[in-house]
Amino acid sequence: MNFLLTNDDGIDAPGIEALYEALGKRGVWVAPKNQHSGCGHKVTTDQAIAVEQRGKNRYAVDGTPADCTRLGVVHFYPEVDWVIAGINAGGNMGIDSYLSGTVAAVREAAILGHKAIAISHWINKPRTINWAWASHWANAVFNTLWQQDLPPQHFWNVNLPHWQSGDPEPEVIFCEPSRDPLPVAFTIEGSNFFYRGEYSQRPRQPGSDIDVCFSGNIAITQLRV
């Protein structure tokens, strides 16, 4: 299979290297030059998009994750079978999919007629991510998803739990995305407002992707454009 790799954390982020390892060091990288977390489905249409080659099959794009998908499937790797975005440092569950550049990259792929997977790693602060573990479980997830039916205009959204040594091995669970809002809270300093919503305090509807992931399992949802 031919893989196109992208993300929203940037081409130098450890997550895309972990993704590459999970795919057996296969695939073409077309990823943002800079960090674009939370950019949503923004695309560049009114100015040039600069691209810098970073060695064989690696391209750093001065644009958004959705720009990277467009350039990748149209110009750099039109023979791609799967577009895969991640591994994102932070969860992309429930309504996060509207905000996430990672999810936007694969939504764009689905719009353009390609199979796609977004994969993210929830961060249970103050823990840090074990990228070797993330790569191991990403590989297991992919081997499951290759066998699943994926209708046109649909894509997979995967969220890894924050596992640490001593925790039970996670199960792979297909589930529904949460529809609950993110916590919205701000602190005020003068005329400045600072977002202070606590991600880990999100509502946990039983069986939702948030509940599955926060419970220590791998949450997989099938989303549509």
Curated annotation (Swiss-Prot):
Catalytic reactions on record: a ribonucleoside 5'-phosphate + H2O = a ribonucleoside + phosphate
Principal localisation: cytoplasm
Cofactor detail note: Binds 1 divalent metal cation per subunit.
Entry-linked InterPro entries: SurE (IPR030048), SurE-like_Pase/nucleotidase (IPR002828), SurE-like_sf (IPR036523)
Function, as annotated: Nucleotidase that shows phosphatase activity on nucleoside 5'-monophosphates.
Name used for this protein in its record: Putative 5'-nucleotidase alr3139
Binding site for a divalent metal cation: D8, D9, S37, N88
TM annotation in the entry: none
The protein's required cofactors: a divalent metal cation
Subcellular localization: Cytoplasm
Gene Ontology molecular function: 5'-nucleotidase activity; metal ion binding; nucleotide binding
Organism: Synechocystis sp. (strain ATCC 27184 / PCC 6803 / Kazusa)
Entry keywords, A to Z: Cytoplasm, Hydrolase, Metal-binding, Nucleotide-binding
